[in-house]
Amino acid sequence: MNFVISQHFNEIKYRFLYIFFTFLLCFIICTIYSESIMFFYVHPLINLTSMQGKHLIFTEMSEAFHTYIFLCFFTSIYCTFPYFFYQFWAFFIPSTYQFERLQLRFLSFFFFTLLFFSCIIIYFIILPEIWSFFLHFEKKSYYFNLQLEARISSYIQFTFQIFSYFFVLFQCPLFTHFSLNLNLLTISFLVNSRKYIYFLFLILAAFLSPPDILSQFFLFSLIVFMYELCVFYSCFYDSLRERIKTF
């Protein structure tokens, strides 16, 4: 018994070492190509402004250095996550039944699909809309000029916050699946509470998006679509579970 436990702990240790060295390698590569990675995150703003006479600034001696480290660190985490997931899968999957493996494969595919589409929508739609709204406050008049000179640290941190918020939002169908499995949610609750939940979504859209009607409507529509997708999935999942019980 002790031998088996020690084997498991040794395997966990080795897998965490693999993950650590993979993260370290990703961090080194990100550090080498940090300027290209910075351009990737700044690109939505560059497309809107063409950066004519504009520039990103840093107001403290070490601010640019800390921003590059922050950027490389979190980019390395995102790049290492699929490998971490693989190591997690390889450790736990031998102890599961066949039906559990099929379910985990479906959930894994579902998770990474939502993750991929959330990245695409955030980068190409949501971020440009947010920056476009804030850039409308630039003014050139006879009395004064008001122009954007964004701090690089504020820009990068705000961009990562937007990514984090919408990553969580796009995983709502997955959260719904686990809640249904644990009997924390029911289909009747999701359907009967729809109007109250829509009202909460409206407040959430007003909080997350800029105070622009089109942006708020777009975000509200996106959240409602995700909610209706959760309701549809819960109905499908419940009917599938009932069919399995009958066999």
Swiss-Prot record:
Where does the protein principally reside?
A: mitochondrion
Q: Which keywords appear in this protein's UniProt record, sorted alphabetically?
A: Membrane, Mitochondrion, Transmembrane, Transmembrane helix
Q: Name one GO molecular function term.
A: proton motive force dependent protein transmembrane transporter activity
Compartment(s) where it occurs, according to its Swiss-Prot or TrEMBL record = Mitochondrion membrane
Q: Which GO terms describe its biological process?
A: intracellular protein transmembrane transport; protein transport by the Tat complex
**Keyword Mitochondrion set for record:** yes
Membrane topology designation: Multi-pass membrane protein
What residue intervals traverse the membrane?
19-39, 73-93, 106-126, 155-175, 196-216, 217-237
Annotated Gene Ontology cellular components are: mitochondrial membrane; TAT protein transport complex
The SS bond pairs are: none
Which Pfam families would you find in this protein's record? TatC
Family statement: Belongs to the TatC family.
| Record protein name field | Uncharacterized tatC-like protein ymf16
Query: Organism, per UniProt?
Result: Nephroselmis olivacea (Green alga)
